[in-house]
Amino acid sequence: ILTGVYEMADMHDVDYVLLLTNNRDQEKKSLSQYCLENNISGLVLHGFSTADPYLLELATLKIPNLLIDIHPEAADSYGIAVNNEVAAYQATEFLISRGHRAIAMISGKSWAQVSKDRESGYQKCMADHHLPTFIYEGLFSEEYSEELVKDILSDHPEITALFCASDLMAIGAVKGIQAMNLNVPQDISVIGFDDIAIAKYVTPSLTTIKQDMHEIGRRSCEILLEILDKGQIDQKQFYVKHSLIERESVSSR
């Protein structure tokens, strides 16, 4: 994302400032203070929870801002992401098309908008096919998901496929499945989300939803510059294309 933002900012000869923040920093200084001290005219925000104090401050900030992976609510806020709900629906539909009927989802952190959107897509697809849902919180953690999947499959041996809301959780799940002396994909199929660089190199290589993070960063800066130039624009939510990358971690039943 950052390289995409920097690339577009450099192209338009725009100065940019990177702020890495946490709860302790936010207690010391408000977002409005930071923007005032650094003469900020526009913001691109990423990695915040939906209840983050900085996000809540946007309603009164009156500075154009673009939120990555969060739905815009404030008057001066705009949003950009892949359509996470549609992409999750597509991933689940892909597993169903391969004959799977008992499909569990390992979601991310409950406070993350992407987790909520991807859960919604999974739930809608399963409901459309009149299938039961199994949703577990994997915290976007490879290690946690590796242990979690053992509990999932022990409690629900009927499950034949997993949709994981990130590739890291999918890789952890594969390790956990293999530790149970089960085979991926012959026994359990796994599909991830992101298409991180390592996804094609793990064994088996990971079937996943690809989102172009560089393009999200580039478009974020491009849209923000357009907003700053025009004052405001009518469109509030923007989407970057995603695609399903089929590799070796899913098989037919």
Q: Can you say where each PLM-predicted feature lies in the sequence?
A:
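Central regulatory/effector-binding core of bacterial HTH transcription factors
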Residues: 6-51
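Short, well-ordered alpha-helical microsegments
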Residues: 28, 51-54, 170-173
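Catalytic-core regions built around general acid/base machinery
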Residues: 33-34, 53-62
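Bacterial carbohydrate/catabolite-sensing allosteric modules
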Residues: 3-17, 42, 59-67, 71-253
